[in-house]
Amino acid sequence: MTSTIYSDALFKLALKEDAIESIIEQFETFVSLARDYPDWIVLLDSPMIRNRVKNKMLTELGIFDALFMNFLMLLVRHHQVRLYEDIYEQWIAKSRLNQKIAYVQLYSAKPLSKKRLNQLKEEIQDYLPGLEIEFNQHIDPTLIEGVKMTYQGRSIERSLKKALDDMRTNI
């Protein structure tokens, strides 16, 4: 709920300022830094460190513009930096929809060829009219064979694991 409020506010402001692309890049940079240095997030969220020290730390990086810095400092002031992953996921979904891109999570037992990826795009294009489809590929050896696609909570699974589970249920 809280992460939705922050992602909505950032999205509306970025839309108003025509800064969607810029914020996407900066948010990706921030997420990458946060994953590489998880203690940094703990530090930014800590009430023991003054906000102006945190602001100075972020400013000294020199990679965030004023709009994104204000957003980060809002999270810092309210001790909500730890929500960055949830906010980022929601932000990406909103920004991709604005750009008419469907970001589909694709799970397979092994990496898929470009030809197979294009076949899958064609198969699901009817379900996502007017959107360009991009896959975020994940390897999941438990699928054994086949694929599972997830988009905004909806899922299509065509895997050997699912077929075996279905047979087991029917027996």
UniProtKB/Swiss-Prot annotation:
SUPFAM superfamilies, A to Z: N-terminal domain of the delta subunit of the F1F0-ATP synthase (SSF47928)
Gene3D superfamilies, sorted: N-terminal domain of the delta subunit of the F1F0-ATP synthase
Major localization listed first in the record, in broad terms: membrane
GO cellular component, one term: proton-transporting ATP synthase complex
Subcellular localization, as worded in the UniProt entry: Cell membrane
Pfam family, one: OSCP
Membrane topology: Peripheral membrane protein
Record keyword Protein biosynthesis present: no
Keywords per UniProt: ATP synthesis, Cell membrane, CF(1), Hydrogen ion transport, Ion transport, Membrane, Transport
Family as reported in the entry's similarity comment: Belongs to the ATPase delta chain family.
Assembly mode: F-type ATPases have 2 components, F(1) - the catalytic core - and F(0) - the membrane proton channel. F(1) has five subunits: alpha(3), beta(3), gamma(1), delta(1), epsilon(1). F(0) has three main subunits: a(1), b(2) and c(10-14). The alpha and beta chains form an alternating ring which encloses part of the gamma chain. F(1) is attached to F(0) by a central stalk formed by the gamma and epsilon chains, while a peripheral stalk is formed by the delta and b chains.
Protein name: ATP synthase subunit delta
Organism: Acholeplasma laidlawii (strain PG-8A)
